[in-house]
């Protein structure tokens, strides 16, 4: 190499300097030249020690340290520069401005030239006998080995006089004592930098170095060496005191840490670094790595994914990982089938942004996880339908990959676990669902023309984005309340009533306005805790059943009635308060039967009696009774109005039926006449054919008759002639 030594550290102080060394006053000692051109013990024995000086006596302290059970190699790569001639002691020209420059990554090799001269002393034992490989305890601590320190100083090195400092590293006449591996000649140890942590990793992180130098947390350097072959010796100078603490290695293994030469210290393997590797590296390679991880480290990875998804500060990092996954084209069904279980859960959780996959709850089969990652199965663990649902080919299912029409909102493309609620609204035709809040924001719930009433009337409808079909909202809300309202608590009931109020806020029809007013009324009373949730539920159900409940008059009168009833029940706690049920309405609207229910016109067998309820009431309750009577009169007027509307609707339906019947009869007669005409034409054609056949046969008969008559006439004439001749 380019470096040389003046013998200030290697030679004996009493020995004269070598005559073969040219005087290079400014030469520097590089680590690669120091380690590659140092004579070996084996070659010294073969070469007879030519060109080498006497060695230093062995160091007893170092020998004692070599017998230690830790088998540590003490070296210091920070003090290997030979002092320049002419420089005062302690002068370090590499320190500029109080800062030490950072060195480039250098790949070091301790392979020695087999034909180089060496003359080690016979008293120095071979270093190969002192190096004992230590088995790896973790995937990150790969082959970290410790060796005993070398007690004796090495012999002085000889140099070729033909080697100049201006010689290029790639020149043809370069000495073959250099390592066959990659070296960075610009990395001189005379810089004395404390940042040469990647010295043993090679240029650009090469993995081909013979020795892996992995720094410890205290700045020292440890060697990881493969087992030495027979006949191969290795040399380490005594000027490299360093030690690898066994306690640090044990702490690294117990804490899940790793030696990272590129970062310069022992540190715990960060879960986010492993997550980035899982996202970017090969599936098979990471599956093998995760296979050796203990369950505690796998749980740490799951916890890191959950924290990344739930934390608002790490949304950018999550989005970055998702973009990396989207750019990968090698993630197929076959590739993901070879993935580790935890690896697959992490990939699905990162891609979908759902932390449920890494919580350990609701374990999903690996095949379904692969389908969820490839967006061929719904990612909702409560649904897990095969996509597209029912082979739907609407504009949403065909364009939005991974969209599930059975549980995902068609507007925001999100899902939740809500069920039996008015917060979701569905289409009657295609079955797509949507959040009510999203539909209201996009104005998908709006008044539309109705088919039930007269022409020009409207009702509140939901416009589906998938099929553009309009579904009426009153019947949907009515069905939800009839099926699910009894199981709701007070909080849920108030939330549902608030959504009902928002849905029918801009309604113009009679039913929608009444439901909006009823929802506001009951919601206000529930907020003031004037009525119980059970009474509120019964009031809403009575509204859906009869159109108007006991106290369903909008405005201040209705609120006053409910408040009066509440105060009355408070004053009469000792008395049993029977439930006052209004008589059944005269008209029962049913979709499966006729519009008018004639049985409802019959008088009720048990007339409503409210006298026992008010017989023991005080005079203060008379006003409440009068208010109730007025309320009943108002209800009677409303019922009469409903009856009139029903009669008008019946008349319109009858007129429609008549016109449709007449039109159908005309169409039927026309089709029947057309069919009969075709049949008649066919019969006429057949008759004409028969007539023609008869005419032809008759003509043949006449010709035969005429021919026979002619023949008979001729015979008669001949007979008369013959008779005359005989006479």
UniProtKB/Swiss-Prot annotation:
Entry's Gene Ontology molecular function annotations: zinc ion binding
GO biological process, one term: maintenance of shoot apical meristem identity
Outcome recorded upon mutating residue 407 to Y: Semi-dwarf phenotype, and reduced growth of roots, shoots and tillers, due to significant reduction of cadmium, cobalt, copper and manganese levels in roots and shoots
Zinc finger map (PHD-type): 406-470
Keywords, comma-separated and alphabetical: Coiled coil, Growth regulation, Metal-binding, Nucleus, Transcription, Transcription regulation, Zinc, Zinc-finger
GO cellular component: nucleus
Region spans: Disordered: 1-136
Bias type Low complexity, positions: 104-117
Chief subcellular location: nucleus
Tissue expression per record: Widely expressed.
Entry keyword annotation includes Nucleus: yes
The keyword Kinase is annotated on this UniProt entry: no
Ranges annotated as biased composition (Pro residues): 14-25
Transmembrane segments: none
Compositional bias ranges of the Basic and acidic residues kind: 67-88
Localization per Swiss-Prot or TrEMBL: Nucleus
Coiled coil: 629-697
Function: Probable transcription factor that functions as a regulator of metal transporter genes responsible for essential metals delivery to shoots and normal plant growth. Required for the maintenance of metal transporter gene expression, such as IRT1, IRT2, ZIP1, ZIP9, NRAMP1 and NRAMP5.
PANTHER family documented for this protein: PROTEIN OBERON 3, VERNALIZATION-INSENSITIVE PROTEIN 3
Protein name: Protein TITANIA
Lineage: Eukaryota, Viridiplantae, Streptophyta, Embryophyta, Tracheophyta
Name of the gene this protein is made from: TTA
